[in-house]
Amino acid sequence: MPERPPLAYLAIGVLSWPLVRFAYRLRWSGLENVPRTGGFVLAANHTSNFDPWPLGMPLFPRRWLRFMAKSELYWRPLRYVLDAGGAFPVQRGGGDVEAIRTAVELVRGGHVVVMFPEGTRRVKGLRKRWAARPHTGAARIAREAGAPLIPAAIEGTDRLSRLGPLRVAYGPPIEVTDDSAETTTRLMAEIRRLHETL
């Protein structure tokens, strides 16, 4: 069993809930695909730094989500917010071995580790969606931890100034094989399919 989330994490969730659920009109589907217990990897598309909130709110407070955050975000005072929110740092571009090891240990310990295979935000009008080559970290972590790989899609976080609506869809587990690249290809295809339903 994973340790209980810190009070700061719970406080962030409680304070965020009215904003995300009602002001931004968050709606979700596919929650039945998300394991209620045990660790797993949750992989989604990435369009905004706000993505963790709508992705995690439907699972709050019964699941404590842990996020990989790029190391350059870890400056004071933001690092305290990231730590309280369950994040841990990763060096982008070099395949951070320590971050992967930490993620595997967290999943084995019963945590939910959130991954964005695109590796960076895809903003409409700035960069064509789905064009970048995805990273295989989510598939590798799920394989090494022997845990489910759950796809998810997020829509609306690139239009926050309009106050929603925000949509999230969770899909059934992706079969994880020894070929992380092939697993990632199927993962991204499912994320894209889910996104088209939003």
Where do the PLM segments sit?
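Non-catalytic C-terminal accessory region of glycerolipid acyltransferases
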Residues: 1-7, 98-198
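A secondary-structure boundary/capping signal
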Residues: 30, 69-70, 86, 116-118, ...
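Catalytic core of membrane glycerolipid acyltransferases/transacylases, capturing the structured
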Residues: 34-94
